[in-house]
């Protein structure tokens, strides 16, 4: 999960609250210009007592890795996350160490252009299943934040409502959700449309299509259904794909946002008949 927004809107607070609610082992790493790859993956050091090299695990050896302000470090350090996010493992000095199950990365970043930030590599962005934006709170929410936040810790009352075993069980249940061929074709058509749009220079990859399918299955499971309907795909199309596409020169000069281009694609691609109606 990648959360992007301006500083001060609660990205890190939400990430910490989410990890506490899951009740899983969590490690947090604050990305800075001097953060190195070994801070993430770990390192080996000679142990004089054991007369051998010992592996010291990094921040990635956990269930939930909170990567705060991920776009404030170097590209070399970012590359250490590629294997971690894709293969759920880290390789140190030629030896591969599997990460605990379940595993997820929750990252926060400020918009590119903010002082001290740099754009994440495309290969890394593509590994995030979904990108969310907090946005500014409305007047009522702002009043609640000021009245409650000034007197107590907003995270103090967050309790664990899940366990690793329960989460793995829910993941298996979501994977078993049925997807009709028409919905598979719909996802494929949507992603293909991003590759043939004059306002987009880089479209959604096959990995992105898989992510859209998986999150649609999870959403259907959450809704209490054993099958995916086209609306499940539409609900998350922009969230799954906005960080995976790159606008062309024409799109940028026109002042378009990735979300608006994706919204036009949603309107232009024919949606299959609702599966619920056919049942």
Label each PLM-derived region with a short phrase.
Residues 1-32:
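Walker A/P-loop
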């Amino acid at each position: 999960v990648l959360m992007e927004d301006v500083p001060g809107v609660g990205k890190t607070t939400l990430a910490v609250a989410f990890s506490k609610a899951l009740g899983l082992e969590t490690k947090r790493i604050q990305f800075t210009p001097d953060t190195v790859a070994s801070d993430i993956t770990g390192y080996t050091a000679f142990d004089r007592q054991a007369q051998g090299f010992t592996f010291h695990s990094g921040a990635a050896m956990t269930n939930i890795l909170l990567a705060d302000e991920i776009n404030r470090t170097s590209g070399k350090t970012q590359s250490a996350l590629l294997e971690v996010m894709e293969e759920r493992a880290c390789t140190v000095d030629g030896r591969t160490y599997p990460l605990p199950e379940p595993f997820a990365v929750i990252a926060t970043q400020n918009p590119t252009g903010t002082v001290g930030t740099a754009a994440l590599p495309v290969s890394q962005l593509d590994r995030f299943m979904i990108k969310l934006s907090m946005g500014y709170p409305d007047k009522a929410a702002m009043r609640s934040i000021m009245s409650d936040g000034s007197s107590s810790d907003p995270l103090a009352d967050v309790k664990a409502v899940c366990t690793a075993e329960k989460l793995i069980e829910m993941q298996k249940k979501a994977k078993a959700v049925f997807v009709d061929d028409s919905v598979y074709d719909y996802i494929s058509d949507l992603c293909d449309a991003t590759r043939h749009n004059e306002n987009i220079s880089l479209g959604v990859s096959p990995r992105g299509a898989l992510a859209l399918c998986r999150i649609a299955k999870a959403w259907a499971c959450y809704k209490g259904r054993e099958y995916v309907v086209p609306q499940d795909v539409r609900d998350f199309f922009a969230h799954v794909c906005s960080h995976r596409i790159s606008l062309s020169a024409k799109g940028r000069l026109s002042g378009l946002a990735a979300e608006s281009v994706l919204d036009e694609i949603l309107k232009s691609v024919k949606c299959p008949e609702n599966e619920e109606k056919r049942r």
